[in-house]
Amino acid sequence: MPLLPEESQWELLTAAGLRNDFQAAWIEGDDRDAIAAELRVDATTTLECDLATALRWMGVGSPTPILWVGPHAPGWTFALALSWDGADFGALDRRVFDFCYARELDEFYGVPGVYGEEGLDDLYLNDDQGDESDLDPHLVAVGRLTGRFVDRAWLAERRTLCRVAS
């Protein structure tokens, strides 16, 4: 795997429609049923869809969090929160790289779990709070640690749109 992706991670996500707030997690594990159970996903209300379809649910004001969940790389699952209430990714009993960026405030919160990891010394990783310019180095770090960067093929994959049970 190369040290850097072919394209800017944040620019790819922005071009795909993630222009506003962004809360997502890279969750260690391939067992999506177990991860869905830990996230308290309501299995009766799911839809397999692409990112463009999932983004139609962004900010709809759902009383319960809406997630888009699916494979990222071998050993890793990706979850995108589509409602700002989001999900409690920190409550998962497994390794998680949790991102949170509020565009309106231009505020990015550092990603717990990446600091101190080997092989990231060449990246400037602000470990507290930052702005939009801090996103790409953190996305590159997560790509290195999970074994896959975001790319156009990744963006085209279908994942599961679901609600978190209240």
Name every feature range the model reports, one short phrase each.
Residues P2-L120:
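Hydrophobic alpha-helical segments that drive targeting, anchoring, or assembly
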Residues D93-S166:
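Long, compositionally biased intrinsically disordered terminal regions
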Residues M1-G17, D151-S166:
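Actinobacteria-biased recognition of intrinsically disordered, low-complexity terminal regions
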